[in-house]
Amino acid sequence: MIRYKISPALQKNHKSRQFYLVFQEALKMLNWKDNDIRCTINVRLDFGMPAGSGRVIHRRGKHTILLHPSPRKPFPWNTVRHEFFHSVLKSKIRSRLSKYTIPLPIPKSYQTQTFRENLEEYCVRALQIIFLQQKNGVQWGQKQVAHEIQQGFTLIPVFVKFFRQWRKTKRSFSRKTFVDLIYFLN
């Protein structure tokens, strides 16, 4: 069961229900349910980060999503979903995939991360693109793919293709999904 804790400051301006709905969207993309995962998700503000950014801190089944919404832009629900994807993937699939390594082109800021972390980053970005493309249209998806390539995630079109095919299977995301993806990339 996932336990959600939304900070009072965020509850004031943004309904807790909206957070729950965004979390449910992510679970649906993974073909999971709330009771498939045991973890705690805390969401709070952190004004020490650049405006408009977000990140997640992972500690033994407890995940803290830190947000610094930009006052001039809409609330970053896409960032909330992105960080939630990371939280639940780390909680449910603990494998480091250490026997697998293939070269993944990544931006310099990601080069200190493990293969598993970088593979997961690609997965989260591809799932976000598919989700938001369904919502915002094909052109939006194409622009986002181009943006991700420009950022250094040059294999993102391959990941999007894999996850489009995987979503048709209706299978739950699992360690096997990671392994299938690795073979797909080879």
Regions found by a protein language model. Name each.
Residues 91-117:
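Post-HEXXH active-site segment of zinc metalloproteases
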Residues 6-16, 67-71, 109-115:
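Second-shell loop/turn segments in exported
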Residues 128-186:
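Pan-zinc metallopeptidase signature
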Residues 26, 118-131:
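An active-site-proximal "capping" alpha-helix that borders the catalytic cofactor pocket
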